[in-house]
């Protein structure tokens, strides 16, 4: 059975497994994103979703309403290019813009599949973030146009 559902605290071990399995945008130290960080983002700062196949989390996304950004969107490498990320992305942005009209942003490394994914999804580049990441933004108006495509 396949489903996208709201992430809960019990999903955090599988969320961490997905986060640490990616080939791009890897963490220099897997301990940088703790279970407590995940819990805070899915219970207090925003909301998260998991893409589950037969009880196994193969992707997840988390939106942060406090900083108006996408905190995470990751898919296991063997499930990339199968629509998992797109579905998680769309559910997350639909929810985000139901909560606020504030422009949402994210950062990702240049020259990655993630960069291409966000460009294709309609995100607009608007500078840099952190250590050389590309900063992308999505407005509520742009999202309403992108969704109709």
Q: Model regions: which residues?
A:
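A short helix-loop-beta-strand connector motif used in the catalytic cores of GNAT acetyltransferases and
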Residues: 39-50, 69
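Conserved beta-strand in the GNAT
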Residues: 50, 56-64, 69-74
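A short beta-loop-alpha structural element at the N-terminal edge
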Residues: 2-17
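Conserved active-site alpha-helix within GNAT-family acetyltransferase domains
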Residues: 86, 110-127, 132
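Conserved GNAT acetyl-CoA-binding A-motif
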Residues: 96-109
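Conserved acetyl-CoA-binding loop-helix of GNAT-fold acetyltransferases
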Residues: 81-94, 120
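Conserved GNAT-fold acetyl-CoA-binding loop/helix
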Residues: 16-43
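A short, internal acetyl-CoA/4′-phosphopantetheine-binding micro-motif in the GNAT/acyltransferase core
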Residues: 73-81, 108-109
